[in-house]
């Protein structure tokens, strides 16, 4: 049962109640979003052109995304799978996210899109310490940033 004020607003199973956007509507959340997939409330994303490009994944970036948002720094994230644990926070907080469909390999088009966004940023922050075989294009992005002489920060929480 979901109560708003003194009235029952909605009732049913969690799957019926917690649909995309329902919690935002129920509690009139306007300066952020409730992420149904993660159960987290995220603040409003920073607007503007991304200043920082973040290479993250597997839970390495969510804390950094929130820190950048709190500091008012617009950022982009790539390349993430839509099933990555970092994806809901990236989607909520980043100005731009370059993402592949869940359970699909990253493709050259993802790399090219991410490279274009990354090269327009002033800085790259890499949260990854290991690049596996399914993450080879993110390793190439990191190498591209190094080769171009971009400012790079290695970040771990």
Residue ranges and their predicted role:
Residues 1-16:
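Conserved switch/coupling elements of ABC/ABC-like ATPase nucleotide-binding domains
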Residues 26-109, 126-128, 132-139, 148-157:
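ABC ATPase nucleotide-binding domains
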Residues 110-120:
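Short, well-structured alpha-helical segments in soluble
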Residues 118, 144-146:
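Short, conserved loop/helix-junction motifs that constitute active-site signature segments
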